[in-house]
């Protein structure tokens, strides 16, 4: 399956886009974007696809995703209830020039 390019909302002057997803299912298609991302699962379970890794997910999972790495979360077909997550996406260059963030930058580049 070919990943689609997601256009992340870049209207925030800080370069950070944060939101809470809430719906009946995690239904975002297999996608990628140049921004880094943290996804924290608040409610729901199913299968997480990140790059060439396929894993189960459950509430409390926190995943860091590197830029341009394809990913998506999928609930099982018989899933009922609510799917909720906190998603934080940021441009790669917002921490690039700050020395205090160098260890984080190195970690993100390996993600």
Q: Could you describe each region identified by the protein language model?
A:
Residues 3-10, 66-111:
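A hydrophobic/aromatic-rich effector-binding and dimerization subdomain
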Residues 1-62:
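Generic protein-terminus/edge-of-domain signal
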